[in-house]
Amino acid sequence: FNGRGFDVPFLYLRSALLNVAITKKNWLGYRFATEPHCDLAEQFTFYGVSGREGAARRFNLDFYCKAFGIDSPKSQGVTGMDINSLLAEGRYRDIAEYCLRDVRATVELYRLWKTRLAGIK
């Protein structure tokens, strides 16, 4: 979720800062293709067609999870904003559990998108 807008650019820039070679440049692919990368944030906003207003405005993963009855990664009280403090406190298990909830929610949302929205022509 939001891989095109955050995850992939973050990984590229972080790799550059740490002098870690980027082994593949085109992880994102063509913007309007859903292979090899499907950015659910773009899919659920229909590529931002209505800008910041209207039915297709951009919401976060937590919003879509709640809207579609999927357990949100934030349901246990941890958010992405907590990661730095959890890391400083050595709470690696809490971080791992949050990441696992995030992956599970993203997979469930992807499956929902694939069955209910992906086939719209």
Named regions from a protein language model:
Residues 1-96, 101-104, 109, 113-114, ...:
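Metal-dependent phosphoesterase core characteristic of DEDDh/y 3'-5' exonuclease domains
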